Amino acid sequence: MNLAVIRLFKHHVNNIPNILPHQLATLDYLVRSIIDENKSVLLFHIMGSGKTIIALLFALVASRFKKVYILVPNINILKIFNYSMDVVINLFNADYILENIFIYSTTSFYSINYNDNVINYNGLSRYNNAIFIIDEAHNIFGNNTGELMTVIKNRNKIPFLLLSGSPITNTPITLSNIISLMSDEEINFSDIIIQGKKVFQILLNEHGVNVLKNILKGRISYYEMPDTDLPGIQYHGKSFLDTRVVYCNMSKLQEKDYINVRKMCNNEMFEKNMNNVSLAVLGQLNLINNLDILFQEQDKELYPNLKINNGVLYGEELVTLNISSKFKYFINKIENLKGKHFIYFSNSTYGGLIIKYIMLSNGYSEYNGSQGTYPKLIHGKPKTFAIVTSKMKASLEDLLVTYNSLANDDGSQIMFLFSSNIMSESYTLKEVRNIWFMTIPDTFSQYNQILGRSIRKFSYKDITQPVNVYLLATVYSDFNDTIESLDDYSLEEINTLPFDIKKLLYLKFKTKETNRIYSILESISDSYTQPPHPHIVEIVLGEIVRQFFYHHSRIKQNDERLLTAVKSVLTNTEAAKKYIKEIVDGHFFVSNKVFDKSLLYAYKDEIITVPFKLSHEPFVWGVNFRKEYNVVSSP
């Protein structure tokens, strides 16, 4: 990161269309490392810091010299990247070749490079002299996409820009995949780790620390946004190590079936069934590993007050909630909470069924769907919920537009957004006041990503109000242990703890090693002080001009303040004056604090900001869908 670029911007205004100083400073680093030196880079910027914008800025710069291929996890994130590209282009003050930039989802990229599940090696030559940008890079390995990237890297000898806010998904071993794409070094991971009996006991040894530093030095950009301009976080529940957890003590009904299912699980840390019964129990259905049975049973009695019929749950138990200590707590608590809720859960088939019918039975209506029993209201309208899973048919983007809209700041359009893992990456939520974990996440990175969807800069108008976080754990009816240290229990004792508590302890064990490695990556992150790279000078100058004219509506053409600002990059006075003339003659777009969206104009001996507004007459499109032609008419 070029610290000299950051120092160009004091009191940077962030509430207008802009490029943040750290994004420009990182762009400088990427240009020097990837374009000039042909090195691969890991962009390890913590969630909410604008990695997508940095990646697209770099893609536009690089497009002048090479083809750029951008891979994203799925079609929904592809849409986000395409939208963000339009935003970035509007702020980009330099030449680019858009035809040299290709954005693919991993599945579509797979389809064009494989024939009958075999890599089409003859087609890989198209990636010669290219640059690859991979979003959420930690997720592409262990599948065909990871294999393909390794082949392309070895055959084509091209650089990669890997984006990740959490490069270690589970254990240090996952870092080996990222290293393999970033260097030509062959690493025997058995030489650099200490392997215990459990997954969380995989540690990086001292030799591993040195290997990590030697291979990745000069290839890491680490950045974490300052926590200013963020609301405080209020964790609820019982003290648990360095956080708080809400203990949800089971009823006798839930506890009985919970124990029966637990006896069936040989390795319960990877058993969906334990996640299921920790969320809610459904009688005999919990003893069957095939969830399709849920939607085939007809008028089957699960408990005296709960039945299922063709995938529909009904009965008084959905209100008394002896089947779920977590939902009993949740339903009782939300009655008195204000604002929007974001609720994470796993196992979308089972969880989605439970959530839908508990919410409907307790008076909450489905967004664009069924109305709740005796509907609860806000401003005279039903309080609604939406469930997001990978199987949802409606557009996720449309749903999020409504959820994030100004009209929904109070939750009057959609109050409760339930989501499985699909929402853990790349999406931004706004004005969320209550975050719930109905399932304990599998990894530390997943936990942080879920929090990071909501608690981020520019997502809250009022940062004086805290965000409530509820991490729910299903526990036995008599369990009330206070856990202060990871050493409070032996491994044998941990195995007897409630599933959620055991999972939390494993998560904390893994977190300890993850944090140690992250601190190593942070320590070798590259920073320097140099004038802006020639390839990004115009982009930096554009941001300097935007910042200047936010504060000034009208100045003399020879204004020394503007000249000084431009000369901070263009040290030659004549070059600076020429640049100022060019942006005025070209009617550079700025956002002024008085006039808002404006264009620069020369008026006599002054430079003025002239507000503008795009408008059009009402019109109607008439389209003939015959194959031969379309007719467009306007009255």
From Swiss-Prot:
Pfam families on file: Helicase_C, ResIII
GO molecular function: ATP binding; DNA binding; helicase activity; hydrolase activity
Alphabetical list of SMART domains matching this protein: DEXDc (SM00487)
Top-rank lineage group of the source organism: Viruses
Binding site for ATP: 45-52
A GO term from the CC aspect: virion component
Keyword Phosphoprotein among UniProt keywords: no
Function: Acts with RNA polymerase to initiate transcription from early gene promoters. Is recruited by the RPO-associated protein of 94 kDa (RAP94) to form the early transcription complex, which also contains the core RNA polymerase. ETF heterodimer binds to early gene promoters.
Subunit structure, interactors included: Heterodimer of a 70 kDa and a 82 kDa subunit. Part of the early transcription complex composed of ETF, RAP94, and the DNA-directed RNA polymerase.
Family: Belongs to the helicase family. VETF subfamily.
Protein's recorded name: Early transcription factor 70 kDa subunit
Phylogenetic classification of the source organism: Viruses, Varidnaviria, Bamfordvirae, Nucleocytoviricota, Pokkesviricetes
